[in-house]
């Protein structure tokens, strides 16, 4: 009799299980969507020392990246200097819409350090992305964002 009851109500049991599973998935997706990506901020003319690790953002190329927010104004001319004795550094400046404004792999001094110059055309929050070139996992680095003074001549 129990078997007959289970089979006769099987569609109701299946519908209830599906509804519960769907509600559970919706709850999980709402929790995941509520997390906002907000990297730490860096101010111009202040040098920071940090460490790129395997706990940072995977690049998909075997390396890792770390982001910093920086507020820039229209007309700013910035230099972004990234140095490391532990890895071949790359630096990127990324606009609020996710587009790459500028990037640099190796600086003009012939080392694997990075030096990027850019003129800002739109005020807003930008991301400075520090990453290791290739499959290097990372290490210690120094990062500095400098607002350059316009030439008065």
Predicted regions mapped to residue ranges:
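Bacterial N-terminal signal peptides that target proteins for export
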Residues: 2-15
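Non-catalytic extracellular/lumenal accessory regions of secreted precursors
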Residues: 2-4, 24, 28-69, 74-76, ...
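Noncatalytic accessory or regulatory domains flanking protease catalytic cores in secreted, cell-surface
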Residues: 3-4, 89-144, 148
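Bacterial N-terminal signal peptides
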Residues: 14-25
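Short solvent-exposed loop/turn micro-motifs enriched in small/polar/acidic residues
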Residues: 62-63, 84-86, 111
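Hydrophobic beta-strand segments within beta-rich accessory/binding domains
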Residues: 69-84, 91, 126-130
């Amino acid at each position: 009799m129990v078997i007959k009851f289970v089979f006769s109500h099987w569609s109701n049991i299946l519908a209830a299980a599906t509804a519960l599973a769907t509600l559970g998935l919706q709850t999980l997706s709402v929790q995941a969507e509520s997390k906002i990506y907000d990297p730490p901020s860096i101010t111009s003319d202040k040098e920071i020392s940090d460490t790129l690790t395997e706990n940072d953002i995977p690049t998909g190329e075997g390396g890792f990246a770390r982001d910093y927010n920086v507020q820039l104004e229209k007309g700013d001319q910035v230099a972004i200097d990234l140095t490391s004795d532990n890895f071949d550094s790359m630096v990127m400046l990324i606009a609020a819409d996710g587009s790459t404004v500028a990037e640099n792999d190796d600086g003009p001094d012939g080392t694997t350090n990075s030096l990027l110059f850019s003129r800002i055309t739109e005020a807003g929050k930008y991301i400075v992305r520090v990453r290791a070139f290739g499959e290097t996992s990372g290490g210690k680095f120094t990062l500095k964002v400098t607002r350059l003074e316009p030439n008065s001549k």
